[in-house]
Amino acid sequence: LSEPRFIDHGEVTANVFAPDSRILEINSKSGLYPLYMAYSIYRARVKNSLFSVSSIEDEQRIWDKVVAENIFVICKTPMAKSITKRTLIGFRKAKINTRYFEDLINQIKNKPEHFIKQVDKFITDRTGIKNMKINAIVGNPPYQIMDGGAGVSAKPVYNLFIEIAKQIAPNYISMIMPSRWFAGGKGLDSFRESMLSDKRISHIFDYVNAKDCFPTASIGGGVNYILWDVNYKGNCSITTIQGTQRDMEQRPLDQFSVFIRYNSAIHIVHKCQSDNSFASIVNSRNPFGLSSNIRGEKTGEIRLITSAGISWLPKSAIDSTNHLLSKYKILMSKVTAEHAGEPDKKGQFKIISRTEIIGPNDVCTDSYLIVGASESKLVVENEYKYI
């Protein structure tokens, strides 16, 4: 390429990358985002003929001025700060606005007001201007931290970076994050409610398979990036990307309590809401009162289905008043996310790993759910076909 790739999105691009724009990245790791930001502003300065460019030295002078006046970067580690500096100015001596925040996640989570003051002080110290307005905040925040729970237990933190960016009050925010917040995610209920009710989110670009965005990363549920515009108030333009296919529709985010990622599914959801829900025949969790670690014997009157296989229990092990015991029913595994939540070769997701019809005197542990229940095997077979 004779020059780097440049993407123009009209008014937003013109505003964000104006010659006098100030852009902040939170959590730079390699400096690639600041590099693109610096190039875009450099391009705007040259295009607007603010500087005469007749030599490599002139180009270098303009570049250094952009990095010194327009780009501000916060890093989570000293190494990230060093790499970002090298990306922007190489090994030369030039002014660069980078700062390493020790324990960045903890500061944003537990001391947000203090963090905002420190960011303001950092920018004031570098520019000599108090309360400078940041035009845009961008970034690829950390996605999660281990929370010390049983087994592999991680808590999302990317939501904290979106929230702190809004508190800093720029004109624009654009960050990329996992798409799990659309409908789930540990501790993300209030964040999801806040996002879906925020009319300032003008665009969401949703990659159903994260590998379409990050080819070497496995991120269950995909990733998305947003454009938040302080001056926008309206429906959101939602683009869903699946391989080479793109589907775009403008619609409100707060139609439902969760975000429906597929535009084509909206009318289906509306139609289904007018009918009886399948949830009405899904039984409560652990209907037989058997924990997931229980294992039976080699013989008995009741067949026990566990994640380890088939065993047997005496009839006295189950409450005789349990209405499910004497009926046909559907055994179903709890929702899973096999292959790290990524689609298979056919682009399909495996959501339920096991479903089967079980009969009278068949029970299961808490590893499974029970759907439907009838003395008629035909009724249960029809319910099974629906699943």
PLM regions: where:
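C-terminal substrate-recognition regions of SAM-dependent nucleic acid methyltransferases
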Residues: 209-387
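SAM-dependent methyltransferase catalytic region
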Residues: 1-204, 209-213, 222, 226-238
